[in-house]
């Protein structure tokens, strides 16, 4: 189970809060809208600098007084805290304590977002991931936080079964969860394929709403194909991920090199 939670957490690491499609969060107001869009730009495609992430968080905080966008404000403050935590952890184990505090803030903001708008599927997806990230830092809390993570993802799926991010994260869970606990590699693969179809249909309608996840869907699709020994399909999926996001370091520097190494070992 912890393997699923850690994998689910990773999918949100450095996720790009780009322009967006409609989502069931609250309606927005013009002044706060501008702050949210500006903050998203500061976060950047791959998290940007630590200063940029803190600046984005400050912009999001200024939107909280606007009841029309408060749910979005809390959502993006949570996303900023989540990505700051990832940045700190990548910089070294000595930052574990500070990262833990940012993940705590992530959960608190997402809980507020769902209190303001109980239909906020995007917030429930990120909340599930945040719980998983907390388990990675403190496995002793796995039993309690694991149930919360599963509950949050289930709620997201109930609210927005065709949301591509919900479908992607559900597929990651299915792919990484052992069969004795209800997981299935085949079910996971089918989920990745469905998520790819849904992302292809996603059309931006509001610059506030999240649309991250398209390139990551192909990264996971490639992983699933490689697990089945279908290396050419895996390579095509990884290349598709890079076509969508050329700076996708996970694919460029980890997944593709691992695939090429596996291919050379299989060569006659």
Question: Positions of the model-derived regions?
Answer:
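Short coil/linker segments at helix-helix boundaries
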Residues: 37-58, 80-114, 119, 123-155, ...
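Terminal, low-structured helical/coil segments at or just beyond the last alpha-helical repeat
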Residues: 201-268
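Canonical tetratricopeptide repeat
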Residues: 76, 126, 169, 220, ...
């Amino acid at each position: 189970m912890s393997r699923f939670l850690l994998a689910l957490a990773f999918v949100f690491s450095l996720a790009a809060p780009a322009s967006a499609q409609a989502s069931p969060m609250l309606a927005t107001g013009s002044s706060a809208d501008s702050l949210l869009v500006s903050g998203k730009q500061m976060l950047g495609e791959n998290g940007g600098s630590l200063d940029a992430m803190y600046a984005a968080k400050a912009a999001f905080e200024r939107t909280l007084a606007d009841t029309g966008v408060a749910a979005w404000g809390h959502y993006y403050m949570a996303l900023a805290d989540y990505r700051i935590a990832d940045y700190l952890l990548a910089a070294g184990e000595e930052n574990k304590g500070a990262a833990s505090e940012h993940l705590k803030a992530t959960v608190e903001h997402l809980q507020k977002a769902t209190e303001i708008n109980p239909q906020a599927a995007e917030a429930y997806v990120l909340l599930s991931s945040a719980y998983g990230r907390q388990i990675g830092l403190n496995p002793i809390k796995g039993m309690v936080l694991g149930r919360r993570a599963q509950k949050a993802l289930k709620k997201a799926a109930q609210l927005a079964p065709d949301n591509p991010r919900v479908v992607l994260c559900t597929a990651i869970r299915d792919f990484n969860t052992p069969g004795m606990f209800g997981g299935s590699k085949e079910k996971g693969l089918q989920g990745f394929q469905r998520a790819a179809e849904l992302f292809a249909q996603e059309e931006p309608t509001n610059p506030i709403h999240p649309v991250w996840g398209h390139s990551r869907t192909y990264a996971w699709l490639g992983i699933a194909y490689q697990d089945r020994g279908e290396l050419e399909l895996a390579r095509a999926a990884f290349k598709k991920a890079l076509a969508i996001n050329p700076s996708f370091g996970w694919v460029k520097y980890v997944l593709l090199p691992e695939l090429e190494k596996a291919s050379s070992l299989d060569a006659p």
